[in-house]
């Protein structure tokens, strides 16, 4: 897949300097495009100059995802576009995004073929169920650094 943004609990406000197509998925999160609410789970065309404001996750889940046609143009590290902030590599300079950062969209929106049909939402039965209770396994790995876990 193409690099996108993982949004934990609260989202950013993004100004698009070029036309794009986005989709917002994952945990339920309100979003507006130039002040008008937009739905999740479907392609949304964005005009150059538009402002996308992503709110705070509500309900089950902690993460939402913003996909952009073509993906974000970030360097790959070991084949991944993910950011690892503790290691200071990957993603956008190996750090969290800050106000004023500019993310470039990879590929060319203009070169993308026209859609055969209009944007269609992902059918509800195909969307993942968001549970309020999770059983998870934990394995020691790079995130096992003292910054994340202590013996207590």
What do the predicted segments below correspond to?
Residues 1-152:
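Conserved "landmark" site that anchors the functional core of diverse proteins
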């Amino acid at each position: 897949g193409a690099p996108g943004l993982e949004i934990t609990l609260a989202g950013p406000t993004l100004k698009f300097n070029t036309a794009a197509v986005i989709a917002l998925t994952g945990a339920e999160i309100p979003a507006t495009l130039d002040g008008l609410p937009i739905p999740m789970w479907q392609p949304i065309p964005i005009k150059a100059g538009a402002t996308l404001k992503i709110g705070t996750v509500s309900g089950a889940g902690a993460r939402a995802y913003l996909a952009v046609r073509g993906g974000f143009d970030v360097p790959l590290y070991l084949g991944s576009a993910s950011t690892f902030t503790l290691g200071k590599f990957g993603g956008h300079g190996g750090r969290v995004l800050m106000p004023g950062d500019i993310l470039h969209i990879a590929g060319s929106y203009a070169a993308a073929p026209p859609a055969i049909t209009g944007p269609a939402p992902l059918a509800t039965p195909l969307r993942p169920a968001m549970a309020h209770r999770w059983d998870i396994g934990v394995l020691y790995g790079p995130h096992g650094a003292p910054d994340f876990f202590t013996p207590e």
